[in-house]
């Protein structure tokens, strides 16, 4: 008999009483069934040279441990192989508020001025029953209210809510406050470090401020869990909460992660999907706006393929020189750069560095030389970093600087503006947004370098005015709740199913203040650009048509 000892984050397999056959069967299952291809490694040099593998295992065969989220699958495979096992439950679960649950199921609970919908109640009840797992509800179906209800259900527990953007932290705080949880809410993000409240909203970028809090956490809610339930930082936080056996992941796109290893990683950390509500169900039940996809076909000159999506940079890294031989080596390294050699040699001869003050002055001088040579210069600690573009990648040539494609986007926008629509255009790179905005007088541009005030102003601009357009970067790709948006234009293309669904979610919400009766998503068929454009377009069309089952129309423009 195999003993499985379960803890909050992992389970351990003990073979003391197992037969040799049971041991061999178990090890085969754990090694073969719980591994996946990590596509982020597939193009790395060691994998391409067959020195390393892009297959990664979740089973630690030295310690005989595995992430707890796979427990249900272990039981399935053990039962299938008729392996004798016993689960030794070591987790100490916090108790739910049964009286609140009773009133919730009767329909007597009101939160934030609204009564939970039947599917939201069903999701919460299933979550309480399972105590670990994913709630996958489509964007616009009220996942934040589900989180608020769970906070009420576990009314005596310390709860950690994971977010990964400033906007989502702000939005979640406002909604939970509206639901009557304001006095119990604390935020750890940026300058905010309130870790004394029962419920803590943590921006993952500020996780180091919360280390002292992790041992006290009993319940984890991972919002937008396709990211907050599986990244290295998220995993570090989850594994640090060793007293939190109750874990729920919440997102519209937990099962569309393109990387098989990362998809499986989310399950291992947070458990499998235990409740699902799709877009077509939300539309049929009139919780979402009926949505139509418009695919715009156009003609343009084919764009040559470079072979790398991102731009390629020449990079320089210089540590602070504190010895004469360091300066000598530095100059020798740049002797081939004729346009720098004179300046470097002059600097070398004039500055024999003997102390920190001279070192700082030398770094400043180098920074000026790099800038004149066309390098973008930054300083990270004591290291000087310089980079300049060696050549542009396919994203720039296919999307950002594709004049024909950008003109098509503007034509689509003008068509919608003539109908007095509120339009959101999403792009991936700031320079693309700047190009598009320059082609649309009177439009608003928002991106990650803008502060919360500017983002809020852009949000209110869309809410309060008809016949307007806002260009937004990936910061508005998810989680932004502006129900008045009529039309969304996918300006950045892309092949990720997760991104396609998240972006589409910006427009499907029902509007309580406007007469929006249909939401329109505009996307471009980039088949004419190159085989890359064709494959990416086919992937997005597959998501719209086959996964989301939304009506589509092809339009020549």
Question: Where is each model-derived feature located?
Answer:
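Walker A/P-loop
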Residues: 130-151
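Inter-Walker segment of RecA-like/P-loop motor cores
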Residues: 178-209
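Post-DEXD/H (motif II) to motif III coupling segment of the RecA-like Helicase ATP-binding lobe
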Residues: 227-292, 544
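A short beta-strand element within the Helicase C-terminal
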Residues: 471, 480-493, 519-523
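Conserved SF2 helicase motif VI
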Residues: 496-517
């Amino acid at each position: 008999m195999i003993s499985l000892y379960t803890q909050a984050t992992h389970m351990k397999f003990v073979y003391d009483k197992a037969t040799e056959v049971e041991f061999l069967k178990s090890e085969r299952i754990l090694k073969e069934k719980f591994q996946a291809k990590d596509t982020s490694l597939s193009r790395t040099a060691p994998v391409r040279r067959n020195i390393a593998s892009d297959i990664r295992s979740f089973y630690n065969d030295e310690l005989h441990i595995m992430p707890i989220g796979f427990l249900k699958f272990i039981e399935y495979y053990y039962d299938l192989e008729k392996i004798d096992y016993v689960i030794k439950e070591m987790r100490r679960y916090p108790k739910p508020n049964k009286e609140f649950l009773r009133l919730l199921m009767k329909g007597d609970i009101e939160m934030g001025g609204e009564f939970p919908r039947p599917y939201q109640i069903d999701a919460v009840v299933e979550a309480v029953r399972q105590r670990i797992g994913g709630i996958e509800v489509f964007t616009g179906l009220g996942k934040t209210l589900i989180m608020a209800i769970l906070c009420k259900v576990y009314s005596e527990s310390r709860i950690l809510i994971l977010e990964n953007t400033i906007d989502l932290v702000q939005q979640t705080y406002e909604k939970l406050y509206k639901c009557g949880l304001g006095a119990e809410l604390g935020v750890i993000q940026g300058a905010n470090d309130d870790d004394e409240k029962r419920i803590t909203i943590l921006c993952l970028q500020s996780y180091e401020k919360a280390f002292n809090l992790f041992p006290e956490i009993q319940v984890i809610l991972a919002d937008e869990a396709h990211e907050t339930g599986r990244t290295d930082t998220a995993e570090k936080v989850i594994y640090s909460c060793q007293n939190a056996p109750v874990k729920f992941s919440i997102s519209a796109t937990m099962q569309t992660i393109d990387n098989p290893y990362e998809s499986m990683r989310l399950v291992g950390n947070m458990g499998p999907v235990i409740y699902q509500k799709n877009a077509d169900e939300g539309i049929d039940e009139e919780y979402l706006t009926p949505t139509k996809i418009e695919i715009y076909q156009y003609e343009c000159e084919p764009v040559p393929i470079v072979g790398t999506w991102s731009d390629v940079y020449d990079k320089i890294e210089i540590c602070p020189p504190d010895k004469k031989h360091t300066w000598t080596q530095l100059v020798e390294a740049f002797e081939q750069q004729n346009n720098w050699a004179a300046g470097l040699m002059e600097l070398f001869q004039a500055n024999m560095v003997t102390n920190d003050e001279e070192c700082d002055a030398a770094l400043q001088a180098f920074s000026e030389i790099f800038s004149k040579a066309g390098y973008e210069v930054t300083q990270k600690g004591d290291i000087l970093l310089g980079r300049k573009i060696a050549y542009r990648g396919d994203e720039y040539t296919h999307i950002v600087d594709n004049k024909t494609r950008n003109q098509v986007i503007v034509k689509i926008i003008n068509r919608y503006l003539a109908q007095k629509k509120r339009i959101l255009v999403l792009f991936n790179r700031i320079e693309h947004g700047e190009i598009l905005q320059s082609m649309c007088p009177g439009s608003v541009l928002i991106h990650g370098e803008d502060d919360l005030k500017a983002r809020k102003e852009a949000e209110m601009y869309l809410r309060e005015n008809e016949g307007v357009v806002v260009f937004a970067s990936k910061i508005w790709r998810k989680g932004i709740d502006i129900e008045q948006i009529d039309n969304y234009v996918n300006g950045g293309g892309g092949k990720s199913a997760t991104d396609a669904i998240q972006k589409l979610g910006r427009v499907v919400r029902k509007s309580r203040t406007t007469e929006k009766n249909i939401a329109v998503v505009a996307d471009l068929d980039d088949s004419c650009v190159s085989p890359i454009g064709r494959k990416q377009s086919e992937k997005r069309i597959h998501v719209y048509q086959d996964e989301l089952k939304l009506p589509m129309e092809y339009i020549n423009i």
